[in-house]
């Protein structure tokens, strides 16, 4: 009888651990207005969200599948991955990039054309207090000390409102696959990718209306990619620069 109870207790413990692990990275697919959207919520107290760019040999990973294989060679399993901001032709980050506490690319405050330079642009970061999104100017005025950070643009939502960036025009007809990120609380990060083309304005509305995010950052469009086995996503498209990843 005692042995049977031990087995039952062990089985319950295994189930509880499995449930906790499953919820640490929780992805779901839903329809927002007329567009299907996939979102993945990372519980940062239970999972270590990292930024990746180059492998141990100094070569850009380029593909989420290459990151997965590299981690597998280290005895780790990639459970979530997504492109993490805009990049140059050589796959180097266009703006600030910090991984493992090391700044590999500085904050980019230049003016230019393209979505990255649409004001306001911003930074997603992870530090001792958790996750947050802030504008580039806020970061420059009071530099934090993140263990990981990536810069992109434009900001989709700022202080609880869709930003006034010209690309956020509600009447815009520019439709693309898009992805972005927000931190609804310091201990959670939510990554979103549209499964079909939509406008900037509609994408920003999802973060504001569905997720209740006060600040959200656009990551990229067209090349947007997701690795999330729990919802059957292992996107392979164009080569990528910086990437987010969760590994166990």
Residue positions per predicted region:
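Bacterial N-terminal signal peptides that target proteins for export
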Residues: 1-10
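Short acidic-glycine loop/turn motifs at beta-strand connectors
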Residues: 43-46, 100, 125-130, 159-160, ...
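Bacterial N-terminal signal peptides
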Residues: 9-18
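Zymogen propeptides
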Residues: 21-115
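Active-site-adjacent helix-turn-beta-strand microarchitecture at beta-sheet edges
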Residues: 92-167
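Conserved, well-ordered active-site substructure
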Residues: 94-110, 166-215, 224-248
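Short, solvent-exposed aromatic-acidic interface loops
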Residues: 54-57, 138-142, 194-197
